[in-house]
């Protein structure tokens, strides 16, 4: 459970870290703050649009291998930030992270519930949510402070290093976890024909896009 909580921590810290570092990133890459905001909104668009199809595409994958792959992709994209020299190269790394994010949260809660001891599924889910909460109240502020002191790219690199350590921990402690899902991309048209689900997806997308739009420019305003 601790390993899964740490995984949630690094993903959520990375998700919101650009909010506090947006002015630094814009100045470093010679872009306006408003244009640099696409790093955040683009991330949100990718997660909103790709979560469902990618979850279906990977539905039959063994869960441990999939999670380790996602953490590996996440870490590599963060390490690559040290070498970005333009907005678009940075954007490419964030798209990679967003794709990993899209699948990560589709498997994390079910995986936590399965890995929890019998009768303690709620504890497993609480551990994952605890990682999310700690990321919001501690990880993002510390990452932002580190970015101001040592450089925004270095802050992302540290998150990548943390993700690599989590990967090694989960490789060691997490047992094999065969998929129990019967979904596939072929079921996507059927899902999209259900009005209730479409309404739920629409509300979720609008909520997340509104949240990211509001968060994006809090730092410059403050």
Question: Predicted regions: what is each one?
Answer:
Residues 174-203:
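Juxtamembrane intracellular "pre-TM" segments in multi-pass secondary transporters
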Residues 87, 93-131:
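Cytoplasmic helix-loop-helix junction between adjacent transmembrane helices
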Residues 16, 44-52, 136-137:
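Residue-level signature of mid-helix packing/kink "hotspots" within the transmembrane helices
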Residues 3-36, 51-54, 214-219:
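Extracytoplasmic
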Residues 19, 198-221:
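Extracytoplasmic gate region of multi-pass secondary transporters
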Residues 49-88:
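Conserved MFS/SLC helix-loop-helix module at the cytosolic interface between two early adjacent transmembrane helices
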Residues 25-26, 57-58, 112, 138, ...:
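Interfacial helix-cap and linker-helix signal at transmembrane-aqueous boundaries
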Residues 160-180:
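C-terminal membrane-cytosol helix-exit motif in multi-pass small-molecule transporters
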